[in-house]
Amino acid sequence: MLQGKLRRSSLKAKLLVSFVIVLILPSIVIGWTSYQQAKTNFNETILQSAEDNVKILNNVINKEIDSKKVDAVYFTKLFNGVSYGTDQLQNVQNKLEEYNKLHPEIEAIYTGSSTGQFIQSPSIQMPDGYNPTERDWYKEAAKKSGEVVITAPYKSSTTGNIVITIAKQNEDKSGVLGIDLIINDIVNTSKMVNIGKTGFVAIFDQSKHVIAHPTMKPGDKIEEKVEKELYKQETGDFKFKLDGDDRNITFITNKQTGWKIAGIMPSKEIIEAANPIFYKTLTVIGISLIIGGVLIYFIIASIISPLKQLVISSKKISEGDLTETITVHSKDEIGQLGESFNEMAASLHHVISNINTSASHVAASSEELTASMKQTSEATEQITQAIEQVSSGAEIQTKEVEEGATLLEGVTEGIQRVADSSSLVSTASMYTKKKAEDGGKLVEQTVNQMQLIHESVSQSDKVIVLLDDKSKQIGAILEVIQHIAEQTNLLALNAAIEAARAGEQGRGFAIVADEVRKLAEQSGQSSTEIGKLVKEIQFDIKETVSSMKQVGTEVQSGLVVANETKQSFAEILKSTDDTVVQIDNMVDVAKQMTVDARQVSASINEIAATIEENAASVQNIAGSSEEQLASVDEINAAAVHLSQMAEELQEMIGKFKV
């Protein structure tokens, strides 16, 4: 169905659809690809930012814990079984208090012996029956002898701070040292980390509870769907929904504590970050479509306009107007088609003109042939009649000779008939003379008409020479315009340089100067193109001058031929006059022969035998004359048919305007 519509559509519609598809589809693909690429880039950038922030927070945690692990190792080397003796307890207490004063980030530092002794700074009264060996921190450190143990975060019962205990068994296994590290600084640091606009960092312990979160409280249980992905691997990223919004999360696991440090950000921020690029892309596509649409309009117009002109001219030629031509403005395929069309029209014009001329000549020749054949037919018929009469006379003369009485009268009658035939020939000669005079007048009119044509050709030659001079003046004016355009371009360039030197104050002037320079360049280019056209016109004028000179020469030759024809008709007329005089003389002689016929009576007997022989020959001649008359009639009929065909051909050619 679509293919059928395209076949019925105009060339303009087909070109428009093709250009629109070529323009819009790549623009949409490029725009959509750019938008998706921007989203991907922003997503990677934000994820990278989240990973960097998570790593920074992980390093902060490691730094805090590492320093306390070093301190714990130091004290476990310092304290031993002797340190828990009664005389050394105060010394241990002093060292712990000194350390506590130097490290405000800790809540307490303490040590417990395997015998149940417990020393702490700051010093507080422990409940009765308190035995450090029964505490989790002591058991875990003793269980992992030689390693530093870090407990899960918990809330201090005395201060309410969130703390972790860093514990290590003494080297001699006489006791365990513990440092309660306040992690409020770590929590506060995590709250200060921003990912994107509304993203944040959260910390979860190894028991899947919240340590730090902007909206959840420490100790809260995390959601099961998040927990499942978060604790499935050491590091990674995934997406989940929170309060109906898509969130991206990237996380790592702190190797010392087992905590999960996660960077969480809304997915809509990626879209919002990519939207400006999307809108800019839409704007660029819109502008491109507008500019492309304008260009497409002019391109299609440059194709369709000459084709429409070609269709109109073709229709005129099909209707018989062979003078129609089209103006060619380009050298592309359409321009070549236009030139070929003009060449075809010129060739057809030349062919029809030649056929018309030939048809006229054939018609004239056929008419002349018809007239000549008619005259020949009449003359032949007269000769046949005369021969028949001579034959009859010969028979009569033969009979009269045989009878011997009526011979002289028969001869006299025959001579009288010859005189009558001579009179008829004289009449035909007078008719021929009249036709020759008419032909002479027609030739004289032709000579006059050829003279008028010669004068018109001479006048056209003068006009074309004047047009050549005018085209040369136009060429000189175009050179001046091109020189002015070059000077304007140079001035615009100088103005742009001065405007650039003026800085921001000359920026507007620089734009104007640049536009002037562009206009100057366009003027120069246009004047150059016009110059080319003027040169082509001058070349065509020279060709026309040469052709007009050739036409003048041909017209002059025609005048010479026409004058010669006129002279020939004059000679024919003179010859006809001479013939008429001779025929008149022949008539007079025939009359004289009638008078003298009686004088030849004595000779009739001698020629009687000869007359009998001639009678048979006359019969043969009469038969041949009749056959010749039939042939002349056939030629005459063919000439008439040829004349009719020539007239029909002229009528057909007359439909064409040449």
UniProtKB/Swiss-Prot annotation:
Residues of the Methyl-accepting transducer domain: 372-622
Cellular component terms, GO, for this chain's entry? Answer: plasma membrane
**One example of a Gene Ontology biological process annotation:** signal transduction
Q: Which residues lie on this side of the membrane: Cytoplasmic?
A: 1-14, 305-658
Topological domain spans for side Extracellular = 36-283
**Localization per Swiss-Prot or TrEMBL:** Cell membrane
- Pfam families in the cross-refs: dCache_1, HAMP, MCPsignal
Keyword NADP part of the UniProt annotation = no
Q: Which residues form a coiled coil?
A: 44-109
SMART domains assigned: HAMP, MA
Q: How does it sit in the membrane?
A: Multi-pass membrane protein
UniProt keyword list: Cell membrane, Chemotaxis, Coiled coil, Membrane, Methylation, Transducer, Transmembrane, Transmembrane helix
Q: Which residues carry this modification: Deamidated glutamine?
A: Q592
* Residue ranges crossing the lipid bilayer per the database entry: 15-35, 284-304
Residue stretches making up the HAMP domain: 301-353
- Positions of modified residues (Glutamate methyl ester (Glu)): E368, E627, E634
Q: Which residues carry this modification: Glutamate methyl ester (Gln)?
A: Q592
List, for all copies, the residue spans of the domain called Cache: 150-221
Question: Could you name the domain of life of the organism this protein comes from?
Answer: Bacteria
Q: Which family is it part of? A: Belongs to the methyl-accepting chemotaxis (MCP) protein family.
What role does this protein play? Chemotactic-signal transducers respond to changes in the concentration of attractants and repellents in the environment, transduce a signal from the outside to the inside of the cell, and facilitate sensory adaptation through the variation of the level of methylation.
Protein name per Swiss-Prot or TrEMBL: Probable methyl-accepting chemotaxis protein BT9727_0469
Q: Which organism is it from?
A: Bacillus thuringiensis subsp. konkukian (strain 97-27)
